[in-house]
């Protein structure tokens, strides 16, 4: 009686918002993907995606997230990885790194 409690959570792990720099890296990835016959890569709405470590430095350096494997059940005991996609993703990432360093 005559007591109260309040709890407040602060979201401190933001999704990576779009910047001119990371959109340029995405444009390069898009071209790499098209050149490899894998189709285009479009940005995903930051409000619909999860957070990433790069989110903390995205305002200070150009970067990209979401180059990893494909599967389902992310970050749960039921997580699966589609191993058939790995070679193509590794090749695409390697070509992206090569082109970014030319």
Summary of predicted features, one role per range:
Residues 1-102:
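Metal-dependent amide/peptide-bond hydrolase catalytic core
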């Amino acid at each position: 009686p005559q007591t109260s409690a309040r709890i407040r959570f602060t979201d401190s792990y933001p999704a990576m918002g779009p910047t001119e720099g990371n959109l340029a890296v995405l444009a390069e990835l898009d071209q790499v993907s098209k050149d490899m016959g894998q189709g285009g890569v479009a940005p995903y709405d930051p409000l619909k995606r999860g957070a990433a470590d790069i989110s903390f430095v995205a305002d200070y350096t150009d970067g990209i997230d979401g180059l990893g494997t494909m599967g389902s059940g992310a970050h749960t005991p039921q997580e699966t990885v589609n191993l058939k996609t790995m070679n193509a993703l590794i090749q695409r990432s390697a070509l992206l790194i090569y082109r970014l360093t030319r």
